[in-house]
Structure formats: C-alpha cells, structure tokens
Amino acid sequence: MSETHLTQQKFADLPLCDEVKQALNENGFEHCTPIQALSLPVLLEKKDIAGQAQTGTGKTLAFLVATFNHLLTTPVPEHRQLNQPRAIVMAPTRELAIQIAKDATLLSKHSGLKVGIVYGGEGYEAQRKVLDKGVDVLIGTTGRIIDYVRQGVINLGAIQAVVLDEADRMFDLGFIKDIRFLFNRMPGAKERLNMLFSATLSMKVQELAYDHMNDPVKVEIAPEEKTSRNIKEEIFYPSMEDKLKLLHSLIEEDWPEKAIVFANTKYQCENLWASLEADGHRVGLLTGDVPQKKRLKILEQFTQSELDILVATDVAARGLHISDVSHVYNYDLPDDCEDYVHRIGRTGRAGQKGVSVSFACEEYALNLPAIEDYIKHSIPVTSYDRDALIDIPPPVKIHRKPHAGGRNLRDRNGSPRPSGSHRSGSGRPPRHDRTRRHS
C-alpha cells in the first residue's frame, strides 16, 4: 500500500489488546489508513460509529480490529448458549462476506475466538454444522442469517458487537427489512458496540443508524473527487458495428494484467464472454445466473491471475474486493451515475495507477451527460482508426465452460505467435503494433 494512503498513526500506539496487535504485526499492518485513524480511537472508547468511507479505504480492517478488541476486553455474557454468537457482521453480498471472513480469520489467530460465515446459494448443511459447534464472530448475508435464526440454529440474544457494512447497498438491494428484523432480536443498542459503514451517509442510512444505534459518532472519509486521480479515464464513441471489434482491439493493444469488462445486462455479458473466449483470452463470466460454486471458483481464478479478464454485471460485482485490477472497460455506459464511480473504482486502488475505458454507443450515449455532471468533470474523448480494428472470430456457444488452459497467444490468422512478440514482465509490445488510438 502506498504511504500516501496511510497516516502517521500506528496500530502499536493504540490501546489494543496484545492478541490483536500481534495479528496486525504478523500481517504487515503498521500504520492506519485515514478511516482507521479516525474511527478506531472512537470505537476503542466503546462509542458507536456511523462511518462514510468508500471501498478500498481500509474500513474492513477498522471494524474487525474494533470487534475483536471489544470481545477480548468485554466479559462474556452470563448464561451465554452455544448457539449465541457474540458479534455479527452483516454484508450485502456473498463475495463481500467471504472477503470479510478471510480478513477476520487472520485477525483471530491469537484471540481464541471462532469465526463463522453463512451465505445463501450453497453449503446450507455444512454452514449449519459450523454453527452447531459455536462461533464467536458471525459473518454473513442477511437472508441466510435469518433462515438460521428462524430455525433456532442461531440466537442473537448475546450479541455484543454489530457491524453493518455497505449500508447504502443494503438499501439498493432491498435488505433493510431483513436488517431491522435482526436488530430487533439483539440486545438493546446500549448493550452492544454498533458500527455502520456506507459509501454515502444518506438520510435513509442515517435514519437506520439512529434507529438501531446508541448516538453514533459520524466519521467521514469522503473523497474530494468522485473518481481517483490515479485512474486515467477515456471515452470512445463507437458505432454499434464497431463496438465489439473496438473492445477486442483495445484489449489486444493494452494487454491488461487484470481487467474487468462491465455491461448493463446479463445477456450482453454472456455475449462478451463468448466472444473473448473464442479469441483465446482467459476470461470469466460473473452474472446473477452463474451458480455460486462457479462464482467463487471464477473469483479465485481471477484473484490468483489464472484469469486475465472478468466480464460482469453491476449487481454481480457489488461487494467484490479484488486487488491489482489494471483496467476497467465500460462496454455499456451505466444508467446509474454511481455505478460508473463504483465500476472504475475497481482500479487505481491503494496508490496504484489504473485505466478506465468507456464506450458511448448509440444506445447508452445519453447516459454520459449525467455521469459527467455527477463526477464533476468531462471524460477525455479518444478517437480510433476503423481500419486498425482487428478481425474477431465467431463467439463460442454460451454453455461452453471457460477455457482452463494458458492464455492463447495465437495471432489473428491462427498461427503461433512468434516467441519474441508476446509480453514479458515489462515493456511487452501489444499483440498488434498498429495503434487504434488517435488523440
């Protein structure tokens, strides 16, 4: 992480218990990010927090450190039962819950506290077996948590710490009734440490906070700009005929280390995956129709750089925490201005440079004025040479499984690529040496 995203505040100087400090030290966490430096002193005084912070600011570590420290310094509730967790973390998506659980497991190493995760889509009985053994910190999506609560597998009567992550997304996805259902089955707000984090502290989010929290302190780490200066933005105006060829051509020219391609519909995402797969790219598809086990496998492959490109819808990508994304391609301009910010925010994180490429086609160009008004700047326009667009092969059938082998380095004619022409660690030339960009 770049030092520009850290403060002078050291975790070692905070009044944290030794078990938490040891875990932080072993995982290389020395200095706090701004949201950690502002929120942890408040939380360590056992005061509630309503925090405004974007994804990638370190908020997950902030609330996990506070949660573990609180449980380790607070007596266990008298007569606590095996099915009663002491802390609960609610997340809007399975992928976000999984990421939080991974981070929590690292912090729990020396604490003696057990972490459990529950989410819909798979593993109902396996998750239940873990809960039956008892967990201290429960992390999950609200729907699956409610299922277990209603069956008596989980009882929330001993909750001492609550985290509601990405509260604004909870509203977007219609989960607020679920959240209120769970809050109403916990001890009163004054009997627990309450933490809420959201990209925006809208009136509805603040109302939720004040309804179920104990006079929370508002902590805001709002970026001065909607989009990071680390992200180079550009926009093309392709014809519908050129649009797919342009995407292929730019990917071949940029040869991104790790890229996400966004489209507005599942149908379009499937078409893009089929086309990129046919061209030999290592590409994964992430939509709401992809089974959960396959989703997790695709995310693991993308995170481990076994896949280079991920094609996704906005809903499927919400809550994903993937580092080192070099490029974001907006094949369709989103209808929601905030989605544009969320999309391109996948790159340029933690001080790294990123590239965002958007297409303003005939169908979605009308979305551009609202987006530029929202981000308060114009997106630089880049033209392209139609004659330089590469030919693309017919798409594979949608039902075909993603290619599991190495990246296909063949040229357009299907012959092997010359050994000296592919990219290596740095300074690697593009697949074709004709540039398509014309400033």
From Swiss-Prot:
Its EC number is 3.6.4.13. It catalyses: ATP + H2O = ADP + phosphate + H(+). Signal peptide: none annotated. Residues 429-439 have a biased composition (Basic residues). Keywords: ATP-binding, Cytoplasm, Helicase, Hydrolase, Nucleotide-binding, RNA-binding. One of its GO terms (cellular component) is cytosol. It is an enzyme of class 3 (hydrolase). A motif (DEAD box) lies at residues 165-168. HAMAP family: DEAD_helicase_RhlB. This is ATP-dependent RNA helicase RhlB. It comes from Shewanella amazonensis (strain ATCC BAA-1098 / SB2B). The lineage of its organism: Bacteria, Pseudomonadati, Pseudomonadota, Gammaproteobacteria, Alteromonadales. The gene is rhlB.
